[in-house]
Regions:
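Conserved acidic catalytic loop of the alpha/beta-hydrolase fold
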Residues: 70-87
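A short beta-to-alpha transition loop/helix N-cap that caps and shapes the active-site region
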Residues: 58, 100, 119-126, 156-157, ...
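Conserved loop-alpha-helix segment in the C-terminal half of the alpha/beta-hydrolase fold
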Residues: 200-237
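Conserved hydrolase catalytic core segment
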Residues: 85-124
Length: 260
């Protein structure tokens, strides 16, 4: 693991392999370890950078609201440190929101985007209300909130099957400080709609969705790519394709990265 001092806080990242730079961004309540099953394969022909987002993993909190733009600026600082001029970004869930914020702020640096169990759309009014409820809940009972949140990301069938994987994911999630959780919920709540990027990006884009995703409705989110050149891949399970569909996802990512 490497560290960078950014705005007086520590940013943690890893840097493996050679070739086209590919940035892997985890989701809410996750950290860079979520990618460990993928790095060896992806690093065979690419330079793979995994980064802990603000208030997650070994990266410290920057404030009380971590906007997607704040995270994108931090990712940019890591790329500057590594003298990387262009990169593809693969973002899981919240990591996808950060990838799109980065694409808007630093368009000239983009080589491709994969939105994994993610969306280009802003929160609906209902989602914003739910984020507010989540902030209240995590402040009242941190452990119960985290444990329940993680289980609810898997398809119903996998909640019974992937017990060990769910426990491991919970253990990583419980390393996330309360401030980091609240700041991310606040940041996601106010994020901009960036569907326009799907229509006008001059680089390859891929949207990967789970048919049984309990968080992002499949039918609703698949409509984002209508009248775009964005490719859509679907898996039969939930919001955690990196755990629920590891082998298939590896193949899809390897195939996509050959195009960037």
């Amino acid at each position: 693991m490497k560290q960078l001092l950014y705005k007086n806080i520590k940013i943690a990242y890893t840097d493996t392999g050679k070739g086209t730079a590919v940035i892997l961004l985890h989701g809410f309540l996750e950290n860079k370890t979520m990618w460990k099953a993928f790095v060896p394969e992806l690093a065979k022909r690419n330079r793979i950078i995994t980064i802990d987002l603000l208030g997650h993993g070994d990266t410290e909190c920057l404030g009380y609201v971590h906007s997607m733009e704040d995270n994108a600026d931090m990712v940019h600082a890591v790329l500057q440190e590594l003298k990387i001029r262009k990169a593809a970004i693969i973002g899981h869930s919240m990591g996808g929101y950060v990838a799109l914020a980065f694409a808007e702020l630093y368009a000239e640096m983009m080589k491709g985007i994969v939105l994994l169990n993610s969306t280009s759309r802003a929160d609906s009014a209902e989602r914003k209300t739910n984020r507010g409820r989540a902030i209240k809940a995590v402040k009242q009972n941190y452990t119960a909130f985290v444990r329940l949140s993680i289980a609810n990301l898997f398809s119903e069938k996998n909640r019974e099957i992937l017990l060990e994987e769910i426990e491991n994911t919970r253990a990583e999630a419980l390393k996330t400080p309360l401030q980091g959780i609240v700041a991310s919920l606040e940041g996601m709540k106010i994020r901009k709609d960036r569907e326009v990027i799907l229509h006008f990006a001059a680089y390859p884009m891929l949207l990967i969705l789970g048919k049984q995703d309990p968080v992002l409705n499949y039918e609703e989110n698949a409509t984002q790519i209508e009248n775009t050149k964005v490719e859509l891949v679907n898996f039969p399970d939930g919001h955690m394709s990196h755990i629920e569909n590891t082998e298939e996802l590896t193949k899809v990512l390897v195939g996509f990265l050959k195009k960037v």
